[in-house]
Amino acid sequence: PTIGKLVDDAMLAIEKSNTSLKGVLPTNYAREALNKTMLGELIDLISTIGMNEESDKSKDILGRVYEYFLGGFAGAEGKRGGEYFTPRSIVRVLTEMLEPYKGRVYDPCCGSGGMFVQSEKFVVEHGGRVGDIRVYGQEMNNTTWRLAKMNMAVRGIDADIKWNNEGSFHKDELADLKA
């Protein structure tokens, strides 16, 4: 099998073992137009990330790598679609103002999930633990929604993120959610 087919099979295996990613991960790496050499080089680069026994540390490293790629993609994709990526510094200030120690965090236009990542970091930095908050969000751009789902999975954040192409202000997928 080609490297693309192996990656597609790996994506399907990940979806099978992580139901929150079902139908989210791309499985089109075997297509002819994709440069197999570059794909192999990217896999080699990612494989150098230290995934050792310290799972929290390895999740953070993988999360930062994901965030780096996400920043580049979201910036380019958002400008094409009239959407904008909220800078991490703004998200950090919002999180500090909200002080999400426990309970629910809801973002009606969650994009790639930056508010959720920062909220979990806030909880941990203030003596709490991941899981002290539950995160909920909505996103109308299907590609960005998929990125958010992957972002949460990479970081081990349990999240309920809904997608609808009308947007949360026109069609609220979480209307029954209470504060």
Sequence positions of predicted segments:
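Non-catalytic, mostly N-terminal accessory regions of nucleic-acid modification and defense proteins
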Residues: 1-101, 160-173
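Conserved S-adenosyl-L-methionine
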Residues: 80-178
